[in-house]
Regions:
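Aromatic/acidic, Gly/Pro-rich catalytic loop(s) in extracytoplasmic/lumenal soluble domains
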Residues: 436-440, 455-459, 463-499
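Short acidic/glycine- and proline-prone juxtamembrane loop motifs at membrane-interface regions
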Residues: 95, 138-152, 190
Length: 499
C-alpha cells in the first residue's frame, strides 16, 4: 500500500454531527423575529439612560477626566463623547456612542460565534445557543453600558472559538485571528485574559502530543503580559463589571445562572448531561465543561455565553434523540420554574404597585404577564412534545421580558434614577473637587461621577466634598438633599464637605 493511502485523515471537529434537513420558513421567521427583538432591546434608551452605578459610572468619569489616555477603551470613549454631545445637550446622548461600541462588540460576538461555533458543533447548535444567549436576562445588559465588558467578551469568545478551530479543527489560518482577539481581550481585561491564556499552558503540559496548543499558548500569554506591562492591570477604578483584580466569581456564577431562568429546564439538564458525558470522555462535554470552569475562575462573560450554548445543545437533543435520558429533568425543572415565576411575579407586582403606582404598575404587569405566559407555553410544549412551543416559549419569555422592561418599565425607573442632575441643580455651587466614592462600599454613588465631571468638578482620591447616601426616613428631604433610586431601592442623596 502506498504512503499516500496510509496517511491518516484529519479528525472531524467535535460533535459536528450531520446537519438536519433544510430549515423551514417558520424557523427562519422565528430566528429573524428574535433577532429583531434582541436588537430593539439593545438600542432602546441608550441616549436617555442615567449612567449605571459601578463600572459605567467610573468608566465614563475616567473618559471625561484627564487620565483617559492611560486606558485604551477610555481613550476611545473620550474621542466618541463629542459626537453624542452634538446631538443633544439636555439628555444623556453624550454617552450614546460609547454605549454603541458595546452594542457592536456584542453583535460581533454573536457573528463569530455563529460562524465558528457552527463549524465546531453544528449550525443548529450555534443558532439555538445564540437564541438562548439573547433570551438571557443579564447578558444583553453588557451591550447597553459604556464599559469594557462587551469588548472583553468579544476578545475571549474569539480566542476560544479560533483556538479550537486551530487545534481541534486543524485550521492553521486561525492563528492570526486568535492573536487579534487575544489583543482585544487583553486591552479590555488584561488579568482575566492572562488567566484564560494560562489554560492553554496547562493544555500544553497535559496534551502536548494530541493537539498543537503550544503556539497559541505562547501568543496569548505574551500578548497579555505585554499589555499588562504597558497599560497596567487597571484594577484601581473598576472599568469593567467582571474581570477585575478583586474576586467576583460568586457574583458571576449567581447572575450567570439567574439570568438563564427562562431556560431553567434546559440549563439544568445540560449541566447534568455535561457531567455524565464528561465521564465518558465525550469531546464536546470535555471542551465546554473545562471552558466553563476556566471562564468562571477568570471572571469572563464568556461563561454566560457557554451556559447558553449548553442550553441550546439540549434543545437540539431533546427533540432529536428518541432515548434522550434527561427528559424528566427538563420537565421537572420547567414546572418548578413556572410555579416560582408566578410567585416571584406576584411579589414583584405587589412591590411595584407601591413603588410605581398607576401607570408604572400596569407596565410592570405587562412585562410579568409576558414572561409567565410564554413560560407556560414552553412548559406545555415540553410535555406535549411540541418543538415550536417548547423552544419558542423559552426564548420569547426572556426576549420579551427584557424588551418590555426597557420599553415599558424603565421610563418610570429612569425618572428617579436621574438624581445626579437634580442634585447638581439644587446645589448651585461653584465647581470644586469631589472625592471618589469607595468602590466596595459606595459604588452606588458612582452614577453621579460623569455628571459632576461635565459640570466642571475635579475628581480625585481626596477632595473638598463627597457624595453621601442615606435611607429614606421621612416624607420630606432637607435642603440640598434629593430623593432617587440607584436601581430599584429609594435613597436620599446629598453633597457634604469632607471633614
Amino acid at each position: 500500500m502506498s504512503r499516500k493511502k496510509r496517511r491518516k485523515s484529519k479528525p472531524p471537529p467535535p460533535s459536528a454531527a450531520a446537519e438536519p434537513a433544510p430549515v423551514s420558513s417558520r424557523w427562519r421567521f422565528f430566528v429573524w423575529m428574535s433577532a429583531f427583538f434582541f436588537l430593539a432591546a439593545l438600542l432602546t434608551r441608550l441616549d436617555v439612560m442615567t449612567a449605571w452605578p459601578g463600572s459605567e459610572g467610573f468608566a465614563l468619569a475616567n473618559a471625561l477626566g484627564n487620565d483617559w489616555g492611560r486606558y485604551l477603551p477610555s481613550a476611545l470613549n473620550h474621542a466618541l463623547l463629542p459626537l453624542g454631545l452634538s446631538i443633544d445637550t439636555a439628555t444623556d446622548a453624550i454617552f450614546l456612542f460609547p454605549r454603541l461600541v458595546s452594542t457592536l462588540c456584542l453583535l460581533l460576538t454573536a457573528f463569530f460565534t455563529y460562524r465558528w461555533a457552527g463549524r465546531l458543533f453544528g449550525r443548529r447548535v450555534a443558532e439555538l445557543g445564540l437564541l438562548c444567549a439573547a433570551a438571557s436576562l443579564f447578558l444583553p445588559f453588557f451591550g447597553k453600558v459604556a464599559t469594557a465588558d462587551a469588548l472583553a467578551l468579544l476578545g475571549h469568545a474569539g480566542m476560544f472559538w479560533s483556538v479550537l478551530l486551530y487545534t481541534v479543527g486543524r485550521d492553521r489560518k486561525k492563528l492570526l485571528p486568535f492573536g487579534i482577539f487575544a489583543l482585544l481581550g487583553a486591552v479590555a481585561a488584561p488579568v482575566s485574559t492572562l488567566l484564560l491564556a494560562l489554560m492553554l499552558v496547562i493544555l500544553v503540559v497535559f496534551q502536548r502530543e494530541d493537539y498543537p496548543w503550544l503556539t497559541p499558548a505562547i501568543v496569548s500569554v505574551g500578548i497579555a503580559c505585554l499589555v499588562l506591562l504597558v497599560q497596567g492591570p487597571q484594577g484601581a477604578n473598576t472599568y469593567w463589571y467582571y474581570g477585575q483584580e478583586d474576586s467576583r466569581v460568586l457574583d458571576l456564577l449567581f447572575y450567570g445562572l439567574l439570568g438563564t431562568l427562562p431556560l431553567a429546564g434546559w440549563v439544568v439538564a445540560g449541566i447534568r448531561d455535561l457531567v455524565f458525558k464528561g465521564k465518558q470522555l465525550e469531546q464536546f462535554s470535555l471542551i465546554i465543561g473545562m471552558a466553563l470552569v476556566v471562564t468562571l475562575l477568570a471572571q469572563s462573560l464568556l461563561f454566560m455565553l457557554l451556559i447558553a450554548i449548553v442550553a441550546g445543545k439540549q434543545m437540539q437533543l431533546y427533540f432529536r434523540e428518541a432515548n434522550y435520558p434527561w427528559r424528566d429533568w427538563v420537565k421537572s425543572c420547567s414546572v418548578l420554574h413556572l410555579v416560582l415565576a408566578f410567585a416571584v411575579a406576584f411579589l414583584a407586582l405587589a412591590g411595584g404597585a407601591l413603588a410605581f403606582p398607576g401607570a408604572g404598575f400596569r407596565a410592570a404587569l405587562g412585562m410579568a404577564a409576558a414572561y409567565w405566559i410564554f413560560s407556560l407555553l414552553a412548559t406545555l410544549g415540553i410535555f406535549g412534545e411540541r418543538r415550536d412551543f417548547a423552544i419558542g416559549g423559552s426564548i420569547l419569555a426572556g426576549l420579551l421580558t427584557v424588551l418590555f422592561f426597557w420599553v415599558q418599565v424603565y421610563p418610570y425607573v429612569e425618572a428617579e434614577r436621574a438624581w445626579p442632575r437634580r442634585l447638581l441643580a439644587r446645589e448651585s455651587m461653584i465647581p470644586s473637587t469631589l472625592q471618589l466614592p469607595d468602590e466596595a462600599d459606595e459604588s452606588e454613588l458612582s452614577s453621579a461621577l460623569p455628571y459632576f465631571s461635565l459640570a466642571g468638578w475635579k475628581l480625585g482620591e481626596t477632595g473638598n466634598y463627597r457624595l453621601r447616601l442615606s435611607p429614606v426616613t421621612a416624607d420630606s428631604t432637607q435642603a440640598g438633599e434629593v430623593r432617587g433610586r440607584v436601581i430599584l431601592r429609594q435613597h436620599v442623596f446629598d453633597l457634604v464637605p469632607v471633614e
